[in-house]
């Protein structure tokens, strides 16, 4: 792995080069487009196409990147954002020890190791911050993502039945968590 000022140079399992780097406030629009593309697939994100405008989502993302209690990593290839991971931490005393992880990867960059690298980056940040837990929610039929999370040490905590409505159908949410103190060093 080569560390550059703009991030860590990586190679996908299919040989394509990409870079892992911290998110920048200027990534807001590119990340909003990535989310819109994945949202249009209709399977992986809870919001429906058109539910959020690109400018408002770009603004919200920029604010998260600036916030001290969140972390955004970006996967970039040929100048395009092809994936990201976000960890946000609530400021409330009761939950300030927990980071909530969300991840999004462009369809043509899945299954090449980017998800594993993004999750590992989130785990490193959680350790540095002294978090006791990373949690996430995933649709139970997203077997590919679940396999990545389990390989990275996440465990299944439960299922919230009929948690989300999507295209007039109700979908369950699988809750997963990773505990740094219980994890072996990766």
Q: What would you call each of these model-derived segments?
A:
Residues 1-14:
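Short acidic N-proximal helix/loop "leader" segments that mark the beginning
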Residues 3-4, 25, 49-108, 119-121, ...:
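Acetyl-CoA-dependent GNAT
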Residues 16-18, 78-84, 171:
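Glycine-rich phosphate/pyrophosphate-binding loop shared by adenosine-nucleotide-utilizing enzymes
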Residues 19, 42-50:
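A short gly/proline-enriched turn/hairpin at secondary-structure junctions
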Residues 19-33:
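A short beta-loop-alpha structural element at the N-terminal edge
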Residues 115, 119, 141-145, 162-167:
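Short glycine/proline-centered loop/turn elements that form peptide/ligand docking sites
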Residues 119, 126-137:
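Conserved GNAT acetyl-CoA-binding A-motif
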Residues 133-139, 150, 155-171:
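Conserved catalytic-core motifs of GNAT/GCN5-like acyltransferases
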């Amino acid at each position: 792995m080569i560390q550059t000022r703009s991030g860590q140079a990586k190679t996908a399992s299919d040989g394509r080069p990409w870079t892992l780097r911290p998110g920048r406030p200027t990534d807001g629009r590119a990340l909003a487009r990535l989310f819109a593309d994945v949202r249009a697939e209709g399977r992986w994100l809870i919001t429906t196409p058109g539910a959020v405008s690109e400018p408002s989502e770009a603004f919200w993302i920029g604010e998260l990147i600036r916030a001290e209690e969140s972390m955004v990593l970006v996967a970039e290839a040929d100048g395009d954002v092809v994936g990201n991971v976000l960890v946000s931490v609530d400021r409330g005393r009761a939950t300030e020890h927990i980071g909530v992880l969300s991840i999004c990867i462009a369809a043509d960059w899945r299954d090449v190791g980017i998800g594993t690298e993004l999750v590992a980056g989130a785990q490193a940040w959680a350790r540095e911050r002294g978090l006791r837990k990373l949690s996430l929610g995933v649709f139970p039929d997203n077997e590919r993502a679940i396999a990545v999370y389990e390989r990275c040490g996440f465990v299944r905590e439960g299922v919230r039945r009929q948690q989300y409505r999507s295209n007039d159908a109700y979908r369950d949410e699988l809750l997963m968590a990773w505990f740094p103190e219980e994890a072996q060093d990766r």
